[in-house]
Amino acid sequence: MLLLELPIKCRMCGRFLRQLLAQESQHSTPVGRFLLPMLMGFRLLILVSSGPGVFGNDENEFICHLGQPGCKTICYDVFRPLSPLRFWAFQVILMAVPSAIYVAFTLYHVIGYWEVPGKENKEQETQISKGDHSKDVSGAKSLKLLWAYVAHLGVRLALEGAALGVQYNLYGFKMSSTFICREDPCIGSTTCFQSHPSEKTIFLNIMFGISGACFLFIFLELALLGLGRFWRIYKHKLSFLKKLPTSESSVRSKDTTDELSVVEAKEPF
């Protein structure tokens, strides 16, 4: 019996996954369906493969002239309050949170409205007995997913913009090779040096470029969704206006026919 039930369960799981993927990408354009996931994957790949080699040993390679105990540690803390690797790792996790919430909402939506074989006819009969229309119900479901998708894009856009601003305030566009430190317990001022500033500048600008491209693509996705929504509303109104004169003319012709029949009936023979 278990062997006989296994293919049925596999088909049901496959149907459920297909419906989940279809609902998740129902309202997205090719920008949100392909370009944004590719950029997120590319950012994660660059960060994991090259980040530790560039910034992994940054504190040990930070050198100061004075050998005063604790001077190097304090100067490095002032020079770099937050490690770039930790900042970018936190950024990747933070950007994934809105997408995870949207996928969870879609999963809840699919589980709540997923129709098991044999259940569809019962739901249709219930809707007909209550006077509901299936198109209205499906339209309401689709509208909820659309607004959830737009909201998650808006949150991602705000987070990307905030991350760009924080990254610029922390690191700028160039990693300097020297740093003048005047903090205690250093005696007077000391000059400190960081290793491979050119390599770190290139990596920093690459991460800036990826974040900027993500910001632009999210904004483009929102713009395309707005234009598509406006175009559908415009087409609906246009088709309604095209149908309106024909309906009015048919009503007028019907009224004219009724008036003629009344006049003919009143005329004496």
From Swiss-Prot:
Localization annotation: Cell membrane; Cell junction, Gap junction
Tissue specificity comment: CNS specific. Expression is restricted to brain, spinal cord, and sciatic nerve.
Gene Ontology CC: connexin complex; gap junction; myelin sheath
Recorded topology in the membrane: Multi-pass membrane protein
UniProtKB keywords: Cell junction, Cell membrane, Gap junction, Membrane, Phosphoprotein, Transmembrane, Transmembrane helix
Single GO MF descriptor: identical protein binding
Residue intervals passing through the bilayer: 34-54, 87-107, 146-166, 206-226
Keyword Phosphoprotein recorded: yes
InterPro entries reported for this sequence: Connexin, Connexin_CCC, Connexin_CS, Connexin_N, Connexin_N_sf
GO BP, one annotated term: myelination
Extracellular side: 1-33, 108-145, 227-269
Pfam families, alphabetized: Connexin (PF00029)
Physiological role: One gap junction consists of a cluster of closely packed pairs of transmembrane channels, the connexons, through which materials of low MW diffuse from one cell to a neighboring cell.
Summary of subunit composition and partner proteins: A connexon is composed of a hexamer of connexins.
Protein name: Gap junction gamma-3 protein
Gene name of the record: Gjc3
